[in-house]
Each structure stands twice: as structure tokens, then as C-alpha cells.
């Protein structure tokens, strides 16, 4: 491999690491900012109306977290697929 390929790989890896650290810090900020707000639903059906309607019963934190987790998982799966 040439030096440019190594540099390209290193910069791409650094980019994905930075993006994932930003995502984790965003989740950390949401949880600690609204830690008294989160209510774990006893049933899945209790959480689905919140996700489907977009209406948030417990302030803005939990809906943001519910909608953000699939994006984070998709990003992690993509980076694993790229580097394996």
C-alpha cells in the first residue's frame, strides 16, 4: 500500500472515531440534562404512541433520545462494514 492510502485510511478512521465520540457525548448530555425526566415504560405499547405521534409527554429529552439511537446504530454498523 502506498503512503496516500495509509493516510486516507487514518483520516477516515479518525473521522469515524470523532463522529462516534460526538454522538456519545450528545447522548450523555441528553441523559444528564434530563435524568429526572426519563420514565422507563412498563410496556412497549406505552412508548410507541410517543414515538409515532411525536408528542412528548415528559419534555423534549426522551423523544430526542428515542429518535437518535437508530441513527447512532446505523452509523456504527456503517463504520464496521467499511473497516472490515
Swiss-Prot record:
Cellular component terms (Gene Ontology): membrane
Bilayer topology reads:
Single-pass membrane protein
Per UniProt, subcellular location reads as: Membrane
The transmembrane residues are: 10-32
UniProt keyword list: Membrane, Transmembrane, Transmembrane helix
Q: Which domain of life is it from?
A: Eukaryota
This protein's name:
Putative uncharacterized protein YPR012W
Native source species: Saccharomyces cerevisiae (strain ATCC 204508 / S288c)
Amino acid at each position: 500500500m502506498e503512503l496516500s492510502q495509509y493516510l486516507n485510511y487514518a483520516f477516515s478512521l479518525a473521522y469515524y472515531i470523532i463522529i462516534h465520540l460526538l454522538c456519545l457525548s450528545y447522548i450523555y448530555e441528553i441523559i444528564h440534562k434530563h435524568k429526572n425526566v426519563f420514565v422507563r415504560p412498563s410496556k412497549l405499547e406505552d412508548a410507541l404512541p410517543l414515538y409515532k405521534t411525536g408528542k412528548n409527554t415528559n419534555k423534549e429529552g426522551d423523544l430526542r433520545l428515542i429518535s437518535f439511537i437508530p441513527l447512532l446504530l446505523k452509523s456504527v454498523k456503517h463504520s464496521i462494514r467499511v473497516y472490515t
